[in-house]
């Protein structure tokens, strides 16, 4: 017969959510910082700028 699983405690749930939010906040901060750097023109970006594909000779 099927038995329901134990309920996850509120503390464990809140701990997981806090971790996810902390990770998301960190990634958002990095993305915002990179965007500001690119827009201000003082970036040392890792990827080369996109080249036009039709300019091959």
UniProtKB/Swiss-Prot annotation:
InterPro entries: Ribosomal_bL32, Ribosomal_bL32_plant/cyanobact, Ribosomal_zn-bd. Transmembrane segments: none annotated. GO terms for biological process: translation. One of its GO terms (molecular function) is structural constituent of ribosome. Disulfide bonds: none annotated. Keywords: Ribonucleoprotein, Ribosomal protein. The keyword Cell division does not apply. Residues 1-35 are annotated as: Disordered. The keyword Lipid metabolism does not apply. GO terms for cellular component: large ribosomal subunit. Residues 1-22 have a biased composition (Basic residues). Belongs to the bacterial ribosomal protein bL32 family. NCBIfam families: rpmF_bact. HAMAP family: Ribosomal_bL32. This is Large ribosomal subunit protein bL32.
């Amino acid at each position: 017969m099927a038995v329901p699983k134990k309920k996850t405690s509120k503390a464990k749930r809140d701990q997981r959510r806090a971790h996810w939010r902390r990770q998301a906040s960190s990634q958002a901060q990095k993305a915002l910082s990179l965007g500001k750097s690119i827009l201000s023109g003082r970036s040392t970006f890792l990827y080369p700028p996109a080249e036009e594909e039709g300019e091959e000779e």
